[in-house]
Amino acid sequence: MPNCLRLGMGAKVVDGRIISLAVQEEVSLGVSKLVERGLEPHLAVVIAGEDPASHIYVRNKEKACKNCGILSTRIDLPSTSSLEDILATVEKLNSDPKIHGILVQSPAPQGVDERIIASSIDPRKDVDGFHPSNLGRLVQGDSSGLLPCTPSGIIRILRESKVEMRGSRAVVLGRSRIVGMPMALLLAQQGVDSTVTIAHSRTEGLQELCREADILVAAVGVPHVVKSDWVKPGSFVVDVGISRVEGGLAGDVSPEASHVAGWITPVPGGVGPMTIAMLMSNTLRAAQEQ
């Protein structure tokens, strides 16, 4: 039996908010050292449109910046903004030496290709970690650069929970460039050493595959798709999904799974706070390296 399992006790709920505060304290110390040298880390957030959820996310990021001592600038663009409008804004930020991190809040206006936007950001300022050169470094086994925030936050959650990842079997449910693919790469990297399977809606025997996972990362955005009988007893379940349903918010994992898992991250309050904390960490790193 792998020693990453926790059996017979019911799931321990892993509070991402507590871990995120520890990360933000680390960032705050790093920011203070830079400020002493006359350098103030500065994050620019571009948001196009009036999507309510996006504006909530941006406010949360601004609050985290304030907590960490990071300057933040918000650039609001209309929902009618074209790709060219957004690229022009990004280019101005790329050329501004006082801006160390650039984030274009998703979703982009309808018809605008977010991949082109990600590719337009200076890789040194790409605090989301989505630029092809940063993702390419990860593919090559180099995790020293700016990493996608949600996957790196999940690795931090696993480490803070004292989970032995080496030799574990991990299943990542979802294959997006934002979470699924980079998550699999991070779990497989040298020093983590999990054996990783990427699963998706076309995967045959999906339930059985998930049930074999010592570490299960659910990132598909389908409310409660992962049932309790998908979960290996004592395993570590990371719920990345967040969907609006009648009565509030729901993750990808059904509540009943907590009776089977050894650890589980809640929705909300699990992965979300860690994503923002790692964004702060990336902004600090970007400022240190520019």
Which positions does each model-derived feature cover?
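Positively charged, low-complexity intrinsically disordered leader regions
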Residues: 9-39
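N-terminal glycine-rich anion-binding loops that anchor highly charged ligand groups
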Residues: 33-43, 49-67
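Short beta-strand elements in bilobed, periplasmic/extracellular small-molecule ligand-binding domains
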Residues: 43, 65-79, 196-198
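Glycine-rich phosphate/diphosphate-binding loop of Rossmann-like nucleotide-binding domains
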Residues: 48-62, 145-232, 236, 248-258
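Short, well-structured alpha-helical segments in soluble
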Residues: 85-97
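Anion-binding alpha/beta catalytic cores of soluble intermediary-metabolism enzymes, centered on
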Residues: 100-170
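Short glycine-/small-residue-rich Rossmann-like dinucleotide-binding loops
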Residues: 107, 219-222, 241-242
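Rossmann-fold NAD(P)-binding glycine/threonine-rich loop
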Residues: 115-126, 135, 241-290
